[in-house]
Amino acid sequence: MFTVTVKNMGTTEYLTAWQAMKNFTAQRTCETPDEIWLLEHPPVYTQGIAGKPEHLLFPNQIPVIKTDRGGQITYHGPGQIILYLLLDLHRWRLNIRQLVRKMEGAVIDLLSEYDVVAQGDENAPGVYVDGAKIASLGLKIRRGACYHGIAFNADMDLTPFTAINPCGYRGLRVTQAKDLGIADCKEMLATKLAQSFINQLTDV
């Protein structure tokens, strides 16, 4: 059985984390252990490789960074749990679609612990509660390994989402754990989310 190392990185600037992920992936070998990084970012919009500038509706003081993950624009900020997945997909015998389903499943299983019913959407990857998005997904695959991962809204200021079409969808509502009555702190939720993903990965 393969193991995954979980590292708590605290608050990390987006560019710093992104460069670290690229370096890790470029330097890894077939023997490099897989890692999950838990962190949060200072306020930042990130725009995926297919991102269209018009999805930033109201430019503001929050910086916009064009990144190498898939997808459109989203927001990261304090109170949002980031799970970066640095995995060898060959090791786990996963294709991208299977990995995305496991990412969604990790969030769905976590929320089910709090009696919150959530679901994925094959046409718009992510996790939703009553049509409102609580988790965004993004990935980059390089030489059979992935980076980027899951952004889970725990207890944050959701206002910056109103300045964008989240993930490129006009009028898409967003929600967070706090507004769903989940009182556990973000640190506990982050730990539980990481374990939930590992359970998905190992089919526990």
From Swiss-Prot:
Catalytic site: 167 (acyl-thioester intermediate)
A Pfam family matched in the record: LplA-B_cat
Cited CDD domains: LipB (cd16444)
Stored InterPro entries: aa-tRNA-synth_II/BPL/LPL, BPL_LPL_catalytic, Octanoyltransferase, Octanoyltransferase_CS
GO cellular component, one term: cytoplasm
PROSITE patterns xrefs: BPL_LPL_CATALYTIC (PS51733), LIPB (PS01313)
Site (Lowers pKa of active site Cys) location in chain: 133
Annotated metabolic or biological route of this protein: Protein modification; protein lipoylation via endogenous pathway; protein N(6)-(lipoyl)lysine from octanoyl-[acyl-carrier-protein]: step 1/2
GO molecular function: lipoyl(octanoyl) transferase activity
Domain BPL/LPL catalytic: 30-204
Locations listed in the record: Cytoplasm
GO biological process, one term: protein modification process
Binding sites annotated in the UniProt record for substrate: 69-76, 136-138, 149-151
Catalytic reaction annotation: octanoyl-[ACP] + L-lysyl-[protein] = N(6)-octanoyl-L-lysyl-[protein] + holo-[ACP] + H(+)
EC number(s) stated in the UniProt entry for this protein: 2.3.1.181
Keywords, sorted A to Z: Acyltransferase, Cytoplasm, Transferase
EC category: transferase
Domain of life, per lineage: Bacteria
Function: Catalyzes the transfer of endogenously produced octanoic acid from octanoyl-acyl-carrier-protein onto the lipoyl domains of lipoate-dependent enzymes. Lipoyl-ACP can also act as a substrate although octanoyl-ACP is likely to be the physiological substrate.
Family: Belongs to the LipB family.
Note: In the reaction, the free carboxyl group of octanoic acid is attached via an amide linkage to the epsilon-amino group of a specific lysine residue of lipoyl domains of lipoate-dependent enzymes.
PANTHER family: LIPOYLTRANSFERASE 2, MITOCHONDRIAL-RELATED, OCTANOYLTRANSFERASE
Name of the protein in its database record: Octanoyltransferase
Protein species of origin: Nitrosomonas europaea (strain ATCC 19718 / CIP 103999 / KCTC 2705 / NBRC 14298)
Species classification: Bacteria, Pseudomonadati, Pseudomonadota, Betaproteobacteria, Nitrosomonadales
Gene that encodes the chain: lipB
